[in-house]
Amino acid sequence: MSSDVKDSSHLEKQNSQEYSNSKQNGEIDIMEMLPQKKMYIIEKQFDQSGKGLKIDEFVRVMLTHLDFDKSDVQKEDQITLALIDLFKEIDVNGDGTMEWEEFSDHIISLGLLRNDRSFKNVIKNYFPSEHIKDNQKHETPIEKIVYFDKLKYLVVLEKDSTRFKVYNANTAELYYEVNAHKCAVLDAEYIPDQNLIATSSNDLTINFWDSSFFIPKQIVSVPEIQLCMRYAKWSTQSQPTYLYTGGSDSIIHIYDTKTLKEKGTIGGWNPFFKRDSQQYGHASPIGDILPINIQTTLVTAGLDANICLWDAATHLPKKELRGHEKGVYSLDWSDFSPMNQCLLSAGLDHEAFVWNTYVKEKIFLLRGHNHPLIGVKCLPGTPQVITADINGMVKVWDVRNFLCMQTINVPTDELNSFVVTSNQKKRIIFGARRLYYYEYDEPKDQMLTDEKMCLRVLYNSVLLCLITLHPDCIKVWDIRTGKLQSVYRELSTAELTVCVLDTRKRKLFVGDADGNIFTVNIKNGAKMKKFEKHNNRMITDLTHWTSKKPATIEIGGDDDDEDGTGDSRRVVSCSREETVFIHDEDSSDPSRSCRYKMKQHKSSVNSLSLKQDSELFASASDDGNIVITNLNSYRQETLPSTQYPFEKKKVIFLDPYNALVTSDSEGYVHFYCVNNGKARTRYLLTKKYETTSVVNNKVDKFPVTHLAFNSDNNMLLLSDELGNVTIWDLTIFLKKLDEIKDDNIQQQKTKQAQTPLKQTPNRASNGFFPTELDELKQINEKQISLSQMDNLEKYFQDKDIAFVHQLKGAHNDGITWIEVLKEYNMFATSSFDCCCHLWSFNDYKKMGSLILGHDIMNNNWQLRVDEEKRKVDAQYYMEKLKKKLNKDDQSDDEEKNSQKQDESMMSDKNFDQKNQKKPKKTEKGEKGEKAPEKPLPEKKKVLTAQEKMEQNKKLKNELKLEFDPALLNLNKNKKQVLSEKEQIEKASELLEKVKKFNDVIANKNKDRRNPLEIDYDDFLRAYQMDEQVDIYLDQNEEEEEDNNILYDLDDPKNQSIPAGAYTSKGAFKSKNIGRKNKI
């Protein structure tokens, strides 16, 4: 019998309601909404950021490109929450950003899951029913089976028989045998609104029978043999109910179920009849008819290999699907979820076709049969598709990935028909010489967590689930209901042995019996990364360490510490060998992931424990030693030996205290004080773990199988191989531990810094040093402290650890793991007895169990989650994110409007400057007299003032655009950058003032042959250099009034400046120009 158990059947019972429930809960499937045509645009948005998108940037990009009604605020909020969850799901490593490679890899991984057997909710195996047998005699082979779900009837039609038999579908009990027609019965259909069963025959009649007592109600004559029939109740406005029949004349007839009269044939015309002038229709006998109510579409298949789609309201043709080479006589519709809706067809071809009704091409072929198929069926509410051929080969497919999950060979020479039932058992019933029943493999005990032992149970506070580890699978359970959510199978070829959560609780690190280590995504079961393999030795324990706490994703945060970058992430593994591997989680090469191999032990390493918020981990070995290792320096320290040199099986840090507990193979529990830094680790106490033996009913010590600590109430939980759980109270022990004066240098400095001023030693009134009395007190305190340190074994006593309670017989076999759920004040246990239970710290009563049975109400699951608080937190986070997005959008809009205004002003200014009339400049100024031209020197060409000014005017527009906003800053104390509009205005003012100044100088020097030539390019460069020095080098200098040179250049007519003052570049390096009194 298969090891797959009732878990999947329970899953599939829920799957049909998953989509509707998710809609009611407001969950959105982002991947379903993702437009493939916009993927290239989205990729560009990722590339522009350079370092990836933060969560607010990611949400903005996705909200822009997702297909939904942007005016629907409620829909936008739901999508925003879904995008936040998606970001956290993809950002498994927690670096706070998402690059395009991560996003695209996530999408690809969803597709790869179609080819991965570890995909969740794996279909269960079928096996022949041991309880249901067909004991009836069949004179001829069974030609066809028809199942009526509402009646739970199975109508059996035998080859060339005028009778039909009615069975109880659940028990195979024969109810009726009806003498129905004069010739062979071909098909049967149930009409629920009239409580009738219709049968068709070779005698050219359709008979209608009362479904309760099979009394004939009406006989309808037909012109041709009707090979198939199908009832349909359409969800259109009038909600008509029809009986469709397909004849050997390739015509489809319509009958009104209320009047049982034919409808749709008027004057010999039938819309389904294919004429030479028509493009659609059938030219051969009809093989099958299928109404798809959700699409108001009628699908017909014929022996001409065509599949036709018709509008349900008008019965006009919609589409024709071509691809089959031979006749088609079986159709079915899969509606497992909106993402998996598809049409399936089968016939004389050896493959079943999968269609999307919106396109004409097939989307997949279900291959694997070597003979013509007899049909294709979908199990309602499940992802299962069944195909069978005439040779008796049956295949079970998963419609989510189109993989063949199981192959069944029915023991018969020729298989003719089969049906599937929608009851709890999901039976498949085959018709050959007799009926063959196949059903799900059911566990004998439905109160189990799995048919195989439960090795670990872990609590995930982020995803609100419990995770159980079994030798061949990992199961995920909803913490709110105790129901099974997902099953991940075939993760490894070897048996799974250990697993541990990462610090962000988004993935699992898993080890197996062959020494393999890999990570699994908890959300979808995808295997993500492998690590260096141990030498074919079973992995005994794993732990995960991050150099700092998991970063919370801040909205728009720029702190490097918040994005998670620069973290050191390590995976520590041990196995049935003496070496402990320290892996680099970020290593890209699995074969070289190990950064360090710790070989301090001399035998098998059994257990690991990480001290939270530190760099230390402890390892316990069969050599009797406990080794403390620093994950950064790899410094190692072996704990002091005790008088009990037995094999160490378990080790645990009592976080947040500086204490460690270990158990050995003889039932002794040892307590140590562990100090950080260079201080020594000290042995404190040993206590025996005792319980009552089942064999002789005597109290004796037993090995401890697992240790767990609850820091909220200082309770230590211990389990044994008898299935008991014992609780010890460590309050007194931990109080004494705090009283010990720690000689750690760093902790001494911290304590001294926190010492109140009134507790400091008294100082002499005339000096700095303490008095002699103070020194004696300090010496005495040190002596007491040292005395305590030397006699710690006497200071700590057995009575410091108080017995609280023992759960006798919590399990029927040895307990493998204890998981503390602090926020609910509960703990969970797993065992070799294949069970997992939940317990309360208040009264130590069972609060529920993780079970396979369908009836979860009997489980009495009592854990309650504060959903409102989680919703409020999610809503607050979303509102905060939306405010950030709105603020950024407003800034973008203002910047765009400013750019448009600047571009408009630049255009207007350029137009005015080009059309402005410029007066001719002469040597005599405004009189207009021409000056004699003087030839330029031959050696060096010198431009005249007029030519120079014309050249500078041509550069005017370019200079305006080259101005740096920081160089025109008029208030350097505030360090505000001018807008582009102010840039252009100030640049224009500067050039106009320089132009006026040039005119003044030229007029004052009109007696000279050549006017003063001002190099405007040099002027502006010198000006820019001056401003750069002020802004960037002296930005911390505080000045009362530090005005730009632009304000120092008042109207040149009101200044008395000697000629030649601006003839050198160095003249402009002085920022402040003294003003003279007005003339």
Curated annotation (Swiss-Prot):
Question: What does the UniProt keyword field contain?
Answer: Calcium, Cell projection, Repeat, WD repeat
GO molecular function terms noted in the UniProt entry = calcium ion binding
Cell compartments where the protein resides: Cell projection, Cilium
Pfam families, per database record: WD40 (PF00400)
Return the Polar residues bias intervals. Answer: 16-25
Report the residue ranges that make up the EF-hand domain in this protein. 78-113
Q: Which residues bind Ca(2+)?
A: D91, N93, D95, T97, E102
Q: Which Gene3D superfamilies match?
A: EF-hand, YVTN repeat-like/Quinoprotein amine dehydrogenase
Q: Which domain of life is it from?
A: Eukaryota
Quote the biased-composition stretches of kind Basic and acidic residues, using this chain's numbering: 1-15, 922-943
Q: Where is this region: Disordered?
A: 1-27, 883-943
Q: Where are the WD repeats?
A: 137-177, 180-219, 224-265, 281-320, 323-365, 368-407, 449-487, 600-639, 643-682, 699-738, 810-849
Primary location class: other
Please verify whether the record's keywords include Calcium.
yes
Q: Which GO terms describe its cellular component?
A: cilium
What is its biological role? Associates with components of the nexin-dynein regulatory complex (N-DRC), a key regulator of ciliary/flagellar motility, and might act as an inner dynein arm (IDA) hub or linkage.
Q: Which family does it belong to?
A: Belongs to the CFAP337 family.
Instruction: Summarize subunit and interaction data from the UniProt record for this chain.
Output: Associates with components of the nexin-dynein regulatory complex (N-DRC) and the CFAP184:CFAP263 complex.
- The entry's protein name is Cilia- and flagella-associated protein 337 A
Q: Which organism is it from?
A: Tetrahymena thermophila (strain SB210)
